[in-house]
């Protein structure tokens, strides 16, 4: 099960459709509850296997720390700019159970280039 969210700006949603299609065809299902922090806590406790999205730091940092401390693998699908702490960089987050991180990253990156 994979959690994600979508931008408030509708014009930004279309570019995310290839990722969503890849997840819907390559994973069990998608969940969206509207809270990045809660989605990350769901990864931390095992209700979700993965979460990906770009959000504001205040939307994800607490859940990121909880997930990381619970043993989740946390990272980004793109390079974090120099001088920006990875824990605060809000773009292209990927947080998963340790066993699925590489496969999920590959799936999402391949969708970006499809």
Question: What are these model-predicted stretches?
Answer:
Residues 1-114:
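An extended, acidic
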